[in-house]
Amino acid sequence: MGIFQSIEEANNTSERLLRSEIKNSHGEFEKFDFDTEEYEINPKRKLRLVSRINPNAGHLRKSKSCFTVDEHVDETRCQKPVMKSPFMSNVDDEIKKKRETITKMTLEIEHHELSQNIRKPTDDLLPDSTYQPYHKKMLKQENRMIQSDIVNGENEADRLSLISDRLGMLNWEVTLQKVTKINDPTDENEMETKRYQTKELIDSMLHKFESMKKKSRNLARRPASSDSLLKLVSGKDWPKIYTRIDRTFIPDYASSSDEEEEKITVEEIRERRLKKREQQCGGSIIVLLSDHQSQKGMTRFAIVAEPLRKPYLIKTSTKERNSWKNKVPTNPKKFKKAPRISTQIAVKRRREVIPLTMEVEPEVIRDIRQDTQKSMKLNVKAEEISVTETVKSKEMNALRNNAASISPTLSEKAPLGSISSCTASQISQRSSENVGAIINNINPNLAIVPSCNEKTFVKTHNGMKTNSGINILPVRKKKKV
């Protein structure tokens, strides 16, 4: 009972660990121990085959050259027998026995036809839905464990790299005693050798870790089962193959359909597969090379570029050269003479300033620019017309004002009754007489205008009031036609 109680207490107190960490009783990491051998047979050391023992004959043999058989003698001549056992005198019997054992190992394949028993669909007694939540829980736990392993690996790599750096410092003896197991710290030879061993071991571990990280990155980039997809892709879906070329892939050819090629020679198989590749990807290119030492017109070497293969150099035979030369006339001509185009010669139209930076102007921008230029020209013309109209309107207003100032004098000189009772001829005569009288009554100071040039007059009287109180309008220059 006491034993069972202690076991139960241990089970209750001890926690279940998902990953084991190698630590000693003090809670420190285990030290490197180079005194005790890790393996019985060192995997890094190369094995050397000293001798071979024939189980049937029981003789020690160095090599095949030592084992000789005479035509008239059936006994084997070799080294002295090490082990006493019944040994065979005839080599043919040994070969026969080997053949018998090999024939016994062959398996006879029996062909069975599967009977098509159509079963009625029934309800699943153990559906997957019952285990779905547990499966999700374990998946999450597994992902957490993987992430924790990655973090622990990174931390361990950092720790080892720090130790290797400290071993290169002046106080490397202190770090070496903490990391490796040393029998005598005062022995300089032991300290130096173990320092070199620890550094070499740490560097190898870090190198393995980096290579593992690189491989994991490459596997993450590569899509799952990419090779299997390539083998199942049909010949029509070539863009997928050209993104990542698989030279071993043959279109419309399964690995199990080689029964047709059993009775064909290797050269015929190569020609057959080459024709398939040429049908899908295009023909191969052959470039004949001439050698200076050979006769003129004779080509001894050629560069061959087949589809989905790297180009290679071959030494041509007379048969190959003749076959290629016969194919040359059937090929299309390389160059064709094209006639000169009429619009090829440039004709000088106008001279334009080209900027230093040449930029291609799109047609849309060019049309917009032309429209804006036209609209600007139209706006300028409209402004000019409006300016002329305003000037004319101002002149007309000034004339009307002058006429209004003159009209009271006319009313004073001629009464209304006399004007209404007069005829048209009389009115015209009187108006002419009145105008002459008004001109005579005008102040002579106002009528006199100082004689000056047109430019000076415009500058002095451009929209300014003179001493006489008359507002002089600006004079507009006449444009040359």
UniProtKB/Swiss-Prot annotation:
GO biological process, alphabetically ordered: subtelomeric heterochromatin formation
After gene disruption, what is the outcome?
Answer: Heterochromatin spreading downstream of the silent mating-type locus HMR.
Q: Where in the cell is it found?
A: Nucleus
According to the UniProt entry, its GO molecular function terms are:
acetyltransferase activity; histone acetyltransferase activity
Q: Cite the residue spans of the region called Disordered.
A: 319-338
Family matches, as Pfam families:
SAS4
**Is the Isomerase keyword given for this protein?**
no
The UniProt record lists the keyword Transcription: yes
Q: Which UniProt keywords apply?
A: Chromatin regulator, Coiled coil, Nucleus, Repressor, Transcription, Transcription regulation
This entry carries the following GO cellular component terms, namely: chromatin; chromosome, telomeric region; nucleus; SAS acetyltransferase complex
Q: Which InterPro entries match?
A: Cullin_homology (IPR016158), Sas4 (IPR038988), Sas4_dom (IPR029184)
Domain of life, per UniProt, equals Eukaryota
User: Coiled coil located at which positions?
Assistant: 90-120, 139-160
- Other comments on record: Present with 800 molecules/cell in log phase SD medium.
Tell me how this protein assembles. Answer: Interacts with ASF1. Component of the SAS complex, at least composed of SAS2, SAS4 and SAS5. These three proteins constitute the core of the complex and are sufficient to acetylate histones.
Function summary = Component of the SAS complex, a multiprotein complex that acetylates 'Lys-16' of histone H4 and 'Lys-14' of histone H3. The SAS complex is however unable to acetylate nucleosomal histones. The complex is involved in transcriptional silencing at telomeres and at HML locus. Also involved in rDNA silencing. In the complex, SAS4 is essential for histone acetyltransferase (HAT) activity of the complex.
According to UniProt, the name of this protein is: Something about silencing protein 4
